[in-house]
């Protein structure tokens, strides 16, 4: 077997490679020997040194050959990088100048925007000729104006739903509310200001606390108004009865003053219990029929002149109302009985007068001589 075959297979091809020049060999090759011996422990001590020399020389040659190539490759990269760094400064795009419109031009654009927010090409060209700019700038202005309108419309609900905002204090020292606040908060402030302190709800308590003394008075007024409406029915009855012979003066409690003609039955019936404020007038004598009719008519026309309305205190309880209503009904029944007795008494008086007159006439006719007729006496 040849010497080459005794070598390790890893270094067989390395032995065939011709040796390179000696100027590439390092000055201190001995420091790599222990490492090479550890890599190939089965190799004889004479040949491995030569093979390791050759391998090491080849590796060093490859490293040296790669270093200049890397250095040469890095130079153009650095040049390119330098060009890239210096390029943007030199070739930077200039920013477009913003077109500034005058007041007249803005007014003209605003008028056209209110008429048509998205003009077509012909309208944009016409506007560009009028204003003196390009059609592209007109298109850009309309686009920005539409975006501004959309922004305003999107911000509108947020302003309405926001809470109350306050501006700095005014010269008088009070807070000036901002009109951008929500309507609920404005209404709440209006409620707190308009109501008196007794009716203003407390912020700490969930329920509203009111003064009971202020509530009782409206309740009493309401009860009195209901009683006044209910008591109109008996009052109307009394007014209808007052058209008949008799005197009546009405007030809030219904039938108050009854002026009756003299009769024994009326005196007995009038001795019934009559509530306070309801009194019978004294009997002044038997008036005639014409006087009765005139007096009743005048009382119906002007009841306040004959009997002024008394001032009644507000009712405090519904039981008092029921008691007053029952007393009013009793007085009305008494008045109806009095009127019925008056009618009956008048009818009996008429009958008696007629009977007496017929009796006197018959007596005078019988006593008078022949050829003479005596006239009946006039009724007193």
Swiss-Prot record:
Gene disruption: observed consequences: No visible phenotype; mice are viable and fertile. Female mice lacking maternally transcribed Obox1, Obox2, Obox5, Obox7 as well as zygotically expressed Obox3 and Obox4 are infertile: embryos arrest at two-four cell stage due to impaired zygotic genome activation (ZGA).
Organism of provenance: Mus musculus (Mouse)
Compartment(s) where it occurs, according to its Swiss-Prot or TrEMBL record: Nucleus
Biased composition (Low complexity): 260-271
GO molecular function, one term: DNA binding
Protein known as: Oocyte-specific homeobox protein 4
Compositionally biased residues, Polar residues: 43-53, 278-302, 351-380
Keyword field: Developmental protein, DNA-binding, Homeobox, Nucleus, Transcription, Transcription regulation
Chain's role: Transcription factor required for zygotic genome activation (ZGA), a critical event in early embryonic development during which the developmental control passes from maternally provided mRNAs to the expression of the zygotic genome after fertilization. Cannot compensate for loss of other members of the Obox family, suggesting that its function differs from other Obox family members. May regulate expression of histone genes in embryonic stem cells. Also involved in completion of meiosis of oocytes during the meiosis-I/meiosis-II transition.
Residues in the DNA-binding region annotation: 94-153
């Amino acid at each position: 077997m040849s010497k080459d075959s005794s070598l390790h297979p890893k270094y067989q091809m390395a032995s065939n490679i011709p040796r390179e020049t000696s100027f590439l060999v390092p000055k201190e090759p001995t420091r790599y020997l222990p490492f090479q011996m550890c890599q190939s422990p089965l190799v004889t001590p004479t040949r491995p040194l030569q093979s390791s020399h050759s391998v090491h020389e080849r590796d060093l040659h490859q490293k040296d050959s790669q270093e200049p190539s890397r250095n040469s490759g890095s130079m153009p990269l650095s040049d390119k990088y330098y060009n890239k760094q210096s390029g943007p400064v030199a070739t930077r795009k200039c920013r477009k100048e913003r077109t500034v419109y005058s007041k007249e031009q803005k007014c003209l654009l605003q008028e056209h925007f209110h008429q048509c927010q998205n003009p077509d090409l012909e309208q944009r060209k016409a506007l560009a000729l009028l204003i003196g700019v390009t059609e592209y700038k007109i298109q850009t202005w309309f686009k920005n104006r539409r975006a501004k309108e959309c922004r305003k419309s999107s911000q509108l609900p947020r302003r309405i739903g926001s809470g109350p905002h306050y501006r700095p204090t005014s010269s008088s020292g009070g807070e000036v509310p901002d009109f951008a606040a929500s309507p609920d908060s404005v209404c709440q402030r209006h409620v707190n200001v308009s109501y008196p302190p007794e009716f203003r709800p407390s912020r700490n308590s969930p329920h509203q606390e009111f003064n009971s003394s202020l509530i009782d008075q409206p309740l009493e007024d309401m009860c009195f108004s209901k009683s006044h409406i209910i008591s109109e029915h008996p009052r109307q009855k009394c007014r209808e009865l007052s058209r008949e012979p008799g005197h009546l003066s009405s007030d809030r409690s219904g039938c108050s003053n009854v002026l009756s003609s003299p009769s024994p039955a009326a005196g007995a019936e009038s001795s019934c219990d009559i509530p306070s404020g309801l009194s019978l007038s004294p009997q002044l004598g038997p008036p005639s029929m014409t006087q009765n009719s005139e007096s009743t008519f005048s009382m119906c026309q002007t009841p306040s002149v004959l009997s002024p309305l008394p001032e009644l205190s507000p009712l405090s309880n519904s039981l008092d109302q029921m008691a007053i209503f029952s007393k009013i009904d009793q007085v009305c029944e008494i008045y109806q009985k009095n009127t019925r007795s008056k009618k009956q008494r008048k009818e009996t008086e008429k009958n008696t007068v007629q009977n007496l007159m017929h009796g006197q006439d018959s007596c005078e006719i019988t006593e008078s001589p022949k050829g003479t007729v005596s006239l009946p006496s006039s009724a007193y």
